[in-house]
């Protein structure tokens, strides 16, 4: 039974990281540094919970998260691509804006700056109102199923489609791509919007799984997803595998925390510490897109 519970925790913890890492891969393959994954997760979680509370529909909640991420990606593109601002600065600013903005919106909508009301657990909100097992509870969230599908679709997009080849060209040789008639700014904007939408679905997983939005609930997962992008060498499948591995560490943290064997502070730092060591060990082997900046 413990194995089933741990599997459920892995699925729930890995899905946000996998989706956020895919968004990071799409964005960075176009030549734009993406440090705003934390913001996308927060905005996706917030939009999903607000839409879920308003509509009672899990489909509407997931769509709202994707839309919020797409709009955030468009905002990122406006400054980083069209206004030529530093993508690093834009990413940090968007993270700060998302943290402060969601707190302010919580206060306005629900009278609390810390958390939202709890989502209903009716048949309309979740596939099964009362999950009989932890595994069924995890699988009742559609983003767990969407994540592996988007891994495959992202890999096919980048390797088998004209848009994917253009995204890669813009990330490797933007001047050559422009000389061949490729609208570099538009392609990068498309990649950022798609990447934002996909990453925000990871936020939907956070909100729907916890049945509420809690201020700063992303908890640094966006930066773990950035690490997964680097460890995966900017390839969708590899990045997803690393993200799933990091998610497994988070699930292990939850399992060990319930046992009381290890101090909570140590467990909370474990995924970040091990990910940092992995990035340090493999950074010399990773080849980023040539024009990434």
In which residue ranges do the predicted regions lie?
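Cytosolic-side transmembrane-helix boundaries in multi-pass membrane proteins
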Residues: 154, 172, 176-186, 253-293
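Inter-helical junctions in multi-pass inner-membrane proteins, predominant
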Residues: 5-9, 158, 195-227, 257-263
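Transmembrane helix-bundle core of multi-pass membrane transporters
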Residues: 98-160, 263-268, 286, 291-293
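Short, non-helical or kinked segments that cap or interrupt transmembrane helices
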Residues: 25-44, 81-94, 211-223, 236-241, ...
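Membrane-interfacial amphipathic/re-entrant helices at transmembrane-helix boundaries
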Residues: 1-20, 33, 47, 55-61
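Hydrophobic alpha-helical segments embedded in the membrane of multi-pass proteins
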Residues: 14-22, 39-46, 67-74, 171, ...
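Helix-loop-helix "hairpin" substructures at the membrane interface of multi-pass membrane proteins
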Residues: 136-213, 236-241
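Alpha-helical transmembrane segments within multi-pass membrane transporters and channels
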Residues: 56-103, 245, 250
């Amino acid at each position: 039974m413990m194995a089933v519970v741990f599997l459920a925790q892995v699925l729930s913890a890995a899905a946000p990281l996998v989706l956020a890492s895919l968004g990071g891969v799409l964005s960075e393959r176009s030549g734009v540094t993406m440090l705003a994954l934390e913001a996308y997760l927060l905005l996706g979680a917030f939009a999903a919970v607000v839409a879920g509370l308003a509509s009672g529909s899990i489909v509407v909640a997931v769509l709202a998260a994707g839309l919020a991420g797409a709009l955030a990606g468009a905002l990122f593109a406006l400054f980083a691509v069209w206004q030529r601002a530093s993508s690093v600065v834009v990413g940090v600013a968007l993270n700060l804006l998302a943290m402060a903005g969601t707190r302010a919106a919580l206060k306005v909508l629900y009278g609390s700056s810390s958390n939202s009301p709890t989502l209903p657990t009716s048949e309309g909100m979740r596939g099964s109102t009362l999950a009989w097992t932890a595994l069924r509870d995890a699988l009742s969230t559609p983003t767990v199923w969407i994540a592996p599908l988007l891994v495959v679709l992202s890999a096919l997009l980048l390797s088998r489609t004209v848009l994917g080849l253009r995204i890669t060209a813009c990330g490797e040789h933007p001047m050559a791509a422009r000389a061949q008639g490729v609208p570099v700014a538009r392609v990068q904007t498309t990649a950022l919007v798609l990447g934002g939408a996909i990453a925000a679905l990871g936020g939907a997983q956070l909100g729907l799984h916890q049945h509420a939005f809690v201020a700063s609930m992303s908890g640094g997962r966006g930066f773990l997803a950035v690490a997964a992008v680097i460890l995966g060498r900017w390839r969708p499948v590899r990045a997803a595998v690393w993200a799933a591995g990091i998610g497994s560490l988070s699930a292990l943290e939850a399992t060990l925390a319930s046992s009381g064997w290890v101090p909570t502070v140590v467990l909370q730092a474990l995924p970040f510490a091990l990910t940092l060591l992995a990035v340090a060990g493999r950074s010399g082997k990773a080849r980023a897109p040539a024009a990434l900046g």
